[in-house]
């Protein structure tokens, strides 16, 4: 019934196993990947023909985590997996990015890759197994995929790279790096970094590339045994005669249009040239009948655009007139919105972002439910890319995959500089509203967010800046571009985003569309990026050099205090009675952690200080010899009970009421009287003995 083929290879501390032929046999390609106790099923299916009029490659990648894979039931009212989580979206993008460039031009059949986590080992993240499985499934399927590729995660612990670190190792690592690539080249890099140098980063990238070579070998061996016949895809035929005619008539006009530095004016000029080409050549007469070839003309026009830009770049001429290493003009403003806790407007050329910071309490932390359990984020960033920022109309609503991905990249870039909860006990929500875009909006988000945090009074560890780099390569000739425009990104060979400062890198993301990117080219790009981000930091420093000493008047004030864990129940009270009364009396929000840490949030200083005073009095220990002012709360025949601290009464025996013989307690004190008492003793059971005699003697003296 089954024709099972299996390949295993040592991959870090564990063995990775690839199996095909047992599950999902009706898919074009299917692989079960096992790493530790993590098991991922990956399938690849492609339509046998393309849709009529299809002009792009409809590839979709879906990474799915099933809660039952970790022995869990989803929380909430709906007890099943519904829309993709942020982690699923990010992992889907992580897989999509290195495989998409490896399909040949002209292949436009709808292709779908699905990776499902069937068993989850909390020690090892499942994304690398899913990435490798997608590569294997596509290679087995017979679709024209120029793979296989491999992938690996690398940490940096005690000054050395670590292959496929465990979750615990990652917590102690200064690096979380994912690299994917073919046998000969790196094609994708994603990372979160704690200030590693350019050389250290490059070493880790190459270490990852070398480490996943045995995995590529295992996939190739599996394909040799069980792979399906490769689909034949006819190479795209270029109508050389039509291309030559278009070059003669319109190439010079395209060159003129691409000399216009302003984006919208350039787009309008290019659109006019394209419209003229479509009108002149979009229809031809064949045997007396009109035949449309507008799609062919549009495709060739794009080739002319690409060639024009790329040739200009290789000659040192960029679209907007800059040199290869020049950064666009930068303008930085802070405190632009009066009621927001921290704001910045960061403008770099025709890319602009409004960054905001909102400070909250621990109640505002983001609760995230994952296969490994529930956790809380006290720092999160939301990136929004509305259609108006590029002069278009379009969908508005929930964030798409691109917005989630760009937001996560900016989050990674900033994580290393966010102060700990002990230093700054606030929840930080950052938003980035892209108001103009012409390339590198995610890096504008990083720069704007740093300024907004400083404006909000957040004591960041150090300012960082982000920059997007590009590459144009033809044969052995290449040019690395700093601070790329949207056109340079679209028509170039590499998108290379780096964030950090003079001390090192905090985030690196790289997507390469071609093969043959050498270590030398990557090193040049990293060094050029370093110079660029230092220039940007200098411009940012003109707006703010450090964080504000005072936070916004509209931001909450959080005071932190520590009590003994045994005292927590006294502060909370029966059914929350005590803490509720403190909140009502002071107007403060109070959070208590299991270790006795108390955070008091208030809109004004006086209320917070009042809450602190009340809590201190609740948890205070009665000390022998200490003098208190208290209220008489109960009268008995043998004495008076006086409340000296919240929830703490002491007894003034009738013999200790005065320096004379007292017949009746009420002759000296009555219920409700405020008296001064001194502690005589506290017995083992916590009972407090008080005296008023010594107070009387002190007053007499």
UniProtKB/Swiss-Prot annotation:
Residue ranges occupied by any S1 motif domain in the UniProt entry: 625-693
Subcellular localization is given as: Cytoplasm
Q: What is its main location?
A: cytoplasm
- Provide a Gene Ontology MF annotation, just one: magnesium ion binding
Domain spans labelled KH: 556-615
Q: What class of enzyme is it?
A: transferase
Classification via Gene3D superfamilies: GHMP Kinase, N-terminal domain (3.30.230.70), K Homology domain, type 1 (3.30.1370.10), Nucleic acid-binding proteins (2.40.50.140)
Chain residues that bind Mg(2+): 489, 495
Per its UniProt record, the required cofactor names are: Mg(2+)
**Keyword set, alphabetical order:** Cytoplasm, Magnesium, Metal-binding, Nucleotidyltransferase, RNA-binding, Transferase
Task: Give the highest taxon in the source lineage.
Answer: Bacteria
Q: Which HAMAP family match?
A: PNPase (MF_01595)
The UniProt entry, under PANTHER family, shows: POLYRIBONUCLEOTIDE NUCLEOTIDYLTRANSFERASE, POLYRIBONUCLEOTIDE NUCLEOTIDYLTRANSFERASE 1, MITOCHONDRIAL
Function text: Involved in mRNA degradation. Catalyzes the phosphorolysis of single-stranded polyribonucleotides processively in the 3'- to 5'-direction.
Q: What is this protein called?
A: Polyribonucleotide nucleotidyltransferase
């Amino acid at each position: 019934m089954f024709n099972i083929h299996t390949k295993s290879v040592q991959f870090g501390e564990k063995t990775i196993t690839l199996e095909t032929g047992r599950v999902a046999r009706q898919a074009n390609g299917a692989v079960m990947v096992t790493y530790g106790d993590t098991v991922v099923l990956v399938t690849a299916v492609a339509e046998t023909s393309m849709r009529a009029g299809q002009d792009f490659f409809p590839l979709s990648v879906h990474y799915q985590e099933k809660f039952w894979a970790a022995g869990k039931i989803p929380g909430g009212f709906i007890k099943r997996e519904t829309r993709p989580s942020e982690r699923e979206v990010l992992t889907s993008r992580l897989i999509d990015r290195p495989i998409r460039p490896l399909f040949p031009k002209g292949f436009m059949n709808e292709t779908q890759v699905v990776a499902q986590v069937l068993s989850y080992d909390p020690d090892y993240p499942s994304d690398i197994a899913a990435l490798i499985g997608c590569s294997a499934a596509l290679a087995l399927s017979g679709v024209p995929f120029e793979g296989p590729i491999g992938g690996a995660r690398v940490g940096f612990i005690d000054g050395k790279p670590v292959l496929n670190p465990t979750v615990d190792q990652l917590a102690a690592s200064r690096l979380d790096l994912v690299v994917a690539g073919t046998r000969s080249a790196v094609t994708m890099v994603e990372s979160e970094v704690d200030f590693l140098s350019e050389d250290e980063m490059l070493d880790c990238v190459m270490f990852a590339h070398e480490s996943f070579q045995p995995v590529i070998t295992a996939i190739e061996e599996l394909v040799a045994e069980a792979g399906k016949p490769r689909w034949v895809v006819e190479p795209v035929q270029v109508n050389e005669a039509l291309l030559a005619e278009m070059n003669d008539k319109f190439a010079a006009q395209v060159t003129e249009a691409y000399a216009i530095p302003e984006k919208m004016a350039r787009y309008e000029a290019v659109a006019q040239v394209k419209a003229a080409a479509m009108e002149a050549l979009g229809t031809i007469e064949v045997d007396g009948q009109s035949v449309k070839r507008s799609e062919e003309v549009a495709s060739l026009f794009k080739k002319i655009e690409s060639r024009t830009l790329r040739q200009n770049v290789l000659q040192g001429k960029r679209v907007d007139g800059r040199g290869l290493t020049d950064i666009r003009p930068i303008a930085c403003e802070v405190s632009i919105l009066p009621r927001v806790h921290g704001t910045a407007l960061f403008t770099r050329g025709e890319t602009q972002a409004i960054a905001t910071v909102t400070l909250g309490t621990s109640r505002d932390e983001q609760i995230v439910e994952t296969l490994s359990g529930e956790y809380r984020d006290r720092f999160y960033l939301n990136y929004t890319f509305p259609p108006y920022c590029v002069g278009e109309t379009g969908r508005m609503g929930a964030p798409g995959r691109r917005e989630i991905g760009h937001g996560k990249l900016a989050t990674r870039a900033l994580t290393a500089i966010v102060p700990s909860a002990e230093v700054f006990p606030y929840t930080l929500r950052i938003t980035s509203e892209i108001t103009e875009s012409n390339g590198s909006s995610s890096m504008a988000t990083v720069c704007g967010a740093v300024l907004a945090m400083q404006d909000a009074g957040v004591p960041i560890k150090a300012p960082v800046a982000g920059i997007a780099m590009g590459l144009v390569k033809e044969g052995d000739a290449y040019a690395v571009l700093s601070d790329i425009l949207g056109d340079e990104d679209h028509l170039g060979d590499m998108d290379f985003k780096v964030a950090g400062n003079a001390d090192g890198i905090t985030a690196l993301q790289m997507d390469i569309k071609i093969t043959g990117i050498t270590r030398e080219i990557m090193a040049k790009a990293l060094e050029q990026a370093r110079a660029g981000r230092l220039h940007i930091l200098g411009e940012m420093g003109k707006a703010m050099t450090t964080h504000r000493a005072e936070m916004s008047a509209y931001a909450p004030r959080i005071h932190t205090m520590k009590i003994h864990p045994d005292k927590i129940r006294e502060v909370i009270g029966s059914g929350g009675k005590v803490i509720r009364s403190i909140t009502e009396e002071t107007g403060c929000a109070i959070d208590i952690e299991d270790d006795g840490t108390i955070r008091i949030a208030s809109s004004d200083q006086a209320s917070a200080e009042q809450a602190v005073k009340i809590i201190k009095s609740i948890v205070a220990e009665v000390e022998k010899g200490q003098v208190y002012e208290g209220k008489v709360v109960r009268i008995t025949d043998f004495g008076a009970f006086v409340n000296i601290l919240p929830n703490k009464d002491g007894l003034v025996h009738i013999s200790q009421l005065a320096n004379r013989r007292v017949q009746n307690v009420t002759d000296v004190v009555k219920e409700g009287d405020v008296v001064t008492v001194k502690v005589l003793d506290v017995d083992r059971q916590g009972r407090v003995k008080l005296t008023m005699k010594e107070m009387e003697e002190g007053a007499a003296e």
